[in-house]
């Protein structure tokens, strides 16, 4: 398979990054805010799935070693650097003094989502690490099964991901699962879907119909998102009913990807 960079994927990442910024600028719980949160983080996991190569990892241990170097080590390097800066600088140290070291260290080393040191966005790295691990195991088990079996297995993963917070009372010491293991379940759904979308060249097959599909997916994502649902957040495992959540997420993702693919065409990009 060609190792050349995909311009459409790079453009889609740019669009998704813009939505991240816009999502943090728009007033919380505004309609646009809820619409962006319906699909912008799922889009990043979907895009990661489009470049996912399970054949690179002969075993789960190989995956842990390789992806640990590229995802978990950067998480600690950036987080501990930020923690050092916030400890030294008096202005930034105020939040640490207010919340206490126990709170700060718990969120860094247990939850995998630094708080009060301005690097909370790094939750994506451990979530991507475990989403990839889940996806690798899922593909090892189901990739060669009949498509109906795969659909049932992916549906089961969807339900597990959206219902995982019901297991929180069973955790003896903390309020949630560690290291974004819960967020990674839903993230794995998008990663697997991205993998199959790329492998089957689904986007390429949709391209002749972009004039209809892009506005259709935009309207559909808005309908299943802010129209029918409340605020959702993959990071916090805050979901609505699975048909609404995944309907809004996948519709928004395909609208974004088809727009990016259209923008990557030579006649437009040049």
Which stretches of residues belong to each language-model region?
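Alpha-helical transmembrane segments and their immediate juxtamembrane cytosolic regions
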Residues: 1-270
């Amino acid at each position: 398979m060609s190792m050349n960079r995909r311009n459409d994927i790079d453009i889609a990442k740019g669009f998704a990054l813009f939505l991240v910024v816009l999502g943090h600028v728009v007033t919380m719980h505004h309609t646009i805010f809820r619409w962006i949160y319906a699909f912008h983080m799922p889009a990043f996991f979907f895009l990661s799935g489009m470049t996912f190569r399970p054949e690179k990892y002969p075993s789960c241990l190989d995956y842990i070693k390789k992806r640990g170097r590229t995802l978990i080590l950067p998480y600690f390097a950036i987080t501990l650097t930020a923690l050092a800066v916030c400890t030294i600088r008096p202005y930034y140290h105020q939040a640490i003094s207010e919340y206490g070291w126990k709170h700060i260290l718990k969120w860094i080393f247990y939850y995998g989502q630094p708080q009060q040191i301005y690097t909370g966005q790094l939750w994506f790295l451990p979530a991507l690490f475990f989403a990839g691990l889940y996806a690798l195991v899922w593909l090892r088990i189901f990739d060669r099964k009949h498509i109906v079996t795969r659909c049932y297995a992916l549906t089961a993963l969807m339900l597990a991901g959206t219902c995982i917070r019901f297991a929180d009372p069973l955790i003896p010491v903390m309020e949630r699962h560690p290291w974004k293991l819960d967020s990674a379940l839903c993230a794995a759904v998008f990663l697997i879907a991205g993998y199959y979308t790329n492998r089957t060249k689904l986007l390429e097959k949709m391209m002749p119909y972009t004039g209809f599909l892009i506005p259709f997916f935009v309207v559909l994502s808005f309908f299943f998102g802010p129209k029918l649902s409340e605020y959702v957040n993959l990071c916090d495992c805050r979901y609505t009913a699975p048909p609404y959540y995944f309907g809004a997420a996948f519709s928004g993702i395909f609208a974004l990807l088809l727009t990016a693919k259209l923008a990557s065409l030579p006649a437009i990009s040049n």
